Regions:
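Short, well-ordered alpha-helical scaffold segment located
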Residues: 19, 65-66
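Helix-turn-helix/homeodomain-like alpha-helical modules used for DNA recognition
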Residues: 68-101
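Intrinsically disordered, low-complexity and often Lys/Arg-enriched segments
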Residues: 1-2, 99
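A sequence-composition feature that detects small, non-aromatic residues
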Residues: 11, 18-21, 51, 81, ...
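Major-groove DNA-recognition helix of helix-turn-helix-type DNA-binding domains
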Residues: 23-60, 67, 83-88
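Polyanion-binding surface elements
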Residues: 2-37
Length: 101
C-alpha cells in the first residue's frame, strides 16, 4: 500500500499591523512609527509604492519590506550610515527566511 502526502505551504506577502506587533513583539505604536519610516523610504526610492497598502482603516505592509527595514533601520535613519545599508533584494531575503529554496 502506498500513501501519498501533499505538503501545502502558503506565504502571504502582506501582513497587518496587529500581526506585525504580535510576530515581532513590539507595540502598535512602534509598528505605526516603522510604517511611517518605511513610507519615507518609499519616497526615497528604496521600496516600491505597493510596500504599504492603506485602504480606510486597513493597513497592510509587505512582509519582506518590513523585515528588510528592521534589519537596516539604524543605518537608514543615519544620513551618514545609510550608504552602508544592504540593498533591498526581495528574492534573496525570501530565501533567507525560508520562503523558498
Amino acid at each position: 500500500m502506498n500513501i501519498t502526502t501533499i505538503n501545502y505551504t502558503r506565504a502571504c506577502p502582506y501582513i497587518s499591523r496587529a500581526n506585525i506587533a504580535d510576530q515581532f513583539s513590539i507595540s502598535l505604536g512602534s509598528v505605526d512609527k516603522r510604517i511611517k519610516e518605511i513610507k519615507q523610504e518609499i519616497e526615497r526610492g528604496r521600496y516600491k509604492t505597493n510596500a504599504v497598502i492603506k485602504d480606510g482603516g486597513i493597513v497592510l505592509v509587505n512582509y519582506l519590506v518590513f523585515i528588510d527595514y528592521e534589519i537596516n533601520r539604524q543605518k537608514l535613519l543615519d544620513s551618514n550610515a545609510r550608504k552602508y545599508a544592504e540593498p533591498y533584494i526581495p528574492s534573496e531575503l525570501a530565501k533567507d527566511i525560508g520562503w523558498y529554496n
